[in-house]
């Protein structure tokens, strides 16, 4: 099954095309805003036509609300045009899997900047071949993460090293996302895809258009 994985929840946006466990092609860019261009780049590298994609996996965050919304909109449009399977996966889960690949073992705090001096925090137990959630995702204050960092706890996350001196920068990766999706079958329709966001968003939807007669 060919899976197109789209991970836009951090500053490093990435897309990967997988066939089973094999990564056929992948591409990433830092600070970019391309979507279709990245997709076409990956498909071209893999020598694959759009019609060959059977499933699209989307990283649902938490993280960059704009990036996640863009990835969801892309997946929704693709499903409407080609009737592919869609699956959404937590970007924090992908970060835990990425930490496992990087041999970051033990109790690990996955931390993502939530703005306003708050952070998304989840704790995982990570060992070779497995990772398990110990503390579910929640919002935490800057002071709490700073205390954990000062106590020598392992902390990883996107661009988190600029906040906490002992923390390691780690980014969600589309190839990891695609491999996580391969083991899942909980496909959903595009209108059910929503970002993981633990507080009311500052983004407001525009009101419906009024018909002027």
Specify the residue positions occupied by each region the protein language model found.
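Short glycine/serine- and small hydrophobic-enriched flexible loop segments
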Residues: 40-41, 76, 80, 179-183
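Phosphate/pyrophosphate-binding loops at sites that engage ATP/ADP/AMP, CoA/4′-phosphopantetheine
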Residues: 39-55, 148-153
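Short, conserved active-site loops that position catalytic residues or coordinate cofactors/metal ions
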Residues: 37-39, 70
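Short hydrophobic beta-strand segments in globular cytosolic domains
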Residues: 23-24
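Oxyanion-binding and handling regions
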Residues: 1-20, 30-33, 37, 87-213
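DPxDG-like acidic metal-binding loop motif
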Residues: 55-86, 91
């Amino acid at each position: 099954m060919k899976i197109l994985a789209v991970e836009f929840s951090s500053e490093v946006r990435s897309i990967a095309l997988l066939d089973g466990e094999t990564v056929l092609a992948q591409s990433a860019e830092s600070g970019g805003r391309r979507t279709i261009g990245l997709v076409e780049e990956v498909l071209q590298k893999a020598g694959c036509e759009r019609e060959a994609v059977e499933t699209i996996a989307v990283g649902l965050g938490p993280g960059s609300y704009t990036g996640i919304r863009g990835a969801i909109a892309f997946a929704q449009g693709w499903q409407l045009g080609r009737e592919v399977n869609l699956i959404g996966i937590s970007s924090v889960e992908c970060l835990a899997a990425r930490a496992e690949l990087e041999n970051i073992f033990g109790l690990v705090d996955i931390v993502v900047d939530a703005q306003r001096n708050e952070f998304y925090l989840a704790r995982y137990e990570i060992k070779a071949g497995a990772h398990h959630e110990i503390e579910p995702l929640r919002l935490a204050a800057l002071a709490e993460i700073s205390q954990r960092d000062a106590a020598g706890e392992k902390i990883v996350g996107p661009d988190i090293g600029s906040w906490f001196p002992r923390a390691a920068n780690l980014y969600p990766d589309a190839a990891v996302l695609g491999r996580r999706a391969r083991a899942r079958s909980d496909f959903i329709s595009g209108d059910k895809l929503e970002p993981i966001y633990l507080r009311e968003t500052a983004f407001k939807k525009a009101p419906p258009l009024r018909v002027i007669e």
